[in-house]
Design a protein with these regions (language model features):
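General marker for long, soluble alpha-helical cores
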Residues: 1-140
């Protein structure tokens, strides 16, 4: 399951942050943990662990899918984890599939994404995802 490279990343993140990760990792689905540690660099993982509360990070890594982890840039993932209300993110995931969310996030600039998450308005976020995903499916 965990290969040596993943184990080394876990150890390095623990060393740099002073956080013990086994309790965090045991609360997150294994597929999500593996995706996060395979797709993200140590520096990105360290920043996430250092800048987001453990409870929010656990919730975020539990609901953010492996597809989202692998197809959204690390910078934008950090923005979602740091500035997003995970309950709102979870509601959006219930309404839209990962594909629509990935398309929308990838089309937004980092500043637009940060602003949208800070506003934390479910209806506005839904409209943005719908418009960007719909425009993408029409080839716009």
């Amino acid at each position: 399951m965990f290969d040596l490279q993943l184990l080394n990343k876990v150890n390095e993140v623990e060393k740099q942050t002073g956080q013990s990760l086994p309790s965090l990792l045991s609360k997150v689905p294994l597929g999500n943990v593996l995706a996060a540690f395979k797709e993200l660099q140590v520096a990105d993982l360290v920043e996430m662990v250092s800048s987001v509360s453990i409870s929010k990070l656990t919730h975020g890594l539990t609901i953010i899918t492996p597809d989202e982890i692998s197809q959204i840039s690390p910078e934008k993932l950090k923005i979602v984890l740091k500035h997003g209300n995970m309950l709102t993110v979870e509601r959006l995931q219930s309404k839209f599939g990962s594909r629509s969310i990935i398309l929308a996030i990838n089309k937004l600039s980092e500043n637009e994404l940060r602003s949208l998450l800070a506003e934390d308005n479910f209806d506005v976020m839904s409209d943005v995802i719908e418009n960007l995903a719909f425009a993408s499916s029409r080839g716009i």
